[in-house]
Amino acid sequence: MEKHLIALSVAALLAGAAPASADIKMGSLYPFSGPLALLGDESARGLEIAVEEINAKGGVQGEKIVLVRGDAVDNNQAIGEARRLISVENVAGIFGTFSSGRAVAASQVSELAGVPYFELGAVADEITDRGLENVYRANPYARDFAQMIVEMLQKKIAPKLGKDSKDLKIAVIYEDSSYGTSVAKHEETFLKEAGLNMVLSQSYPGNTVDMSSLVLDLKSAGADVVLQTSYQSDSVLFLQQANEGGYKPSAIVGAGGGYSLQPTADAVGHDVIEAAYDVDFTQFAVNTSFTPGLEEFVEAYKKKYGETPRSGHSLTNYVGAKVILEALNKVKGFDAAAVKQALSAVDIEAGKTAMGYGFKFDQNNQNERASMMGMQWQDGKLVTVYPDAAAISEIRLPQ
């Protein structure tokens, strides 16, 4: 009898106890190894800081967010890792991915599974132009690069060179993945619409080990402005071989990627990259009155990782992830309808985030308020020079 009463008492206690809070798993899908690992890891760091801050304030829908990593070393592995995260880890959503090709591949998997995919850094048009219901992008995309680059050519670079922008001989060179081809396509369109003179448009394999023939082609075309869309290794290779070949155009303009990385400048030499331009997500040498919260992010980053941010990709992922997670905290569940309800309600004006740009998701689930910054390498540092409201320095001519 005594044993029976004890058993009943224990059962009653267990029945009356509140169930333990279950963590919410989210995928963190980036290239953590392979040629894109540096920017992949840098992007993931921003997501990690955002999740830590959200969890410190109670999590999402009362539960802690736990990130589960997936290594998207290439497109095929991105597909395999997305499947694993969904079917084995049972994630409620996937954040990623930095690489456009990997994002396109992996997001198709999540769409078919009905799992939301939140892109925080990849820029290819097709990520959000396919009309997929469960794929959202918080960051600017390929068109925004090209628009800002051509605008800078007309309003800043050509006047500084003492030339009419229509007298410039412009070359477009790009790595041949979704990232490079998307940006280059828009550059060609905007250059044509502006009536500017494009003398060469040429792609190359992203894993190339020799760009000397491309440098010769640029010389032969008489290009005095080069627009390059590239990751880190090909950015370094082009800058090195152009310098070695004595090719010194009046302006080199990168579209993010390797041109936004301090390790790129360190690898080629600060004198080689001096005065090169870069259009990309917000970086750190910027008028912080335009980017509230940026300085606090930098301090959080240094505290967690023991170094300063290596690129603005961490900031971009951080801001996008926080906006999305805070929105999800206002609904119940993570099904397609709940996510749509949460993100459709997001309405943040420009100048209110650490990126400077605002947030509002359009009919394709693209943040239509996302925008780029124009920067230049000066004295070994990447500083903002455009738009004027965000600039901290005037542009310089190469020596």
UniProtKB/Swiss-Prot annotation:
Keyword Ribosomal protein: no
Record keywords: Amino-acid transport, Signal, Transport
Top-level taxon in the UniProt lineage: Bacteria
InterPro entries associated with the record: BCAA_transport, Leu-bd, Leu_Ile_Val-bd, Peripla_BP_I
CDD domains: PBP1_ABC_ligand_binding-like
UniProt GO BP: amino acid transport
Listed Pfam families: Peripla_BP_6 (PF13458)
Residues spanning the signal sequence: 1-22
SUPFAM superfamilies: Periplasmic binding protein-like I (SSF53822)
Gene3D superfamilies noted in UniProt: 3.40.50.2300
Ranges that cross the membrane: none
Keyword NAD: no
Reported function: Component of an amino-acid transport system.
Family: Belongs to the leucine-binding protein family.
Protein's UniProt name: Leu/Ile/Val-binding protein homolog 7
Organism: Brucella suis biovar 1 (strain 1330)
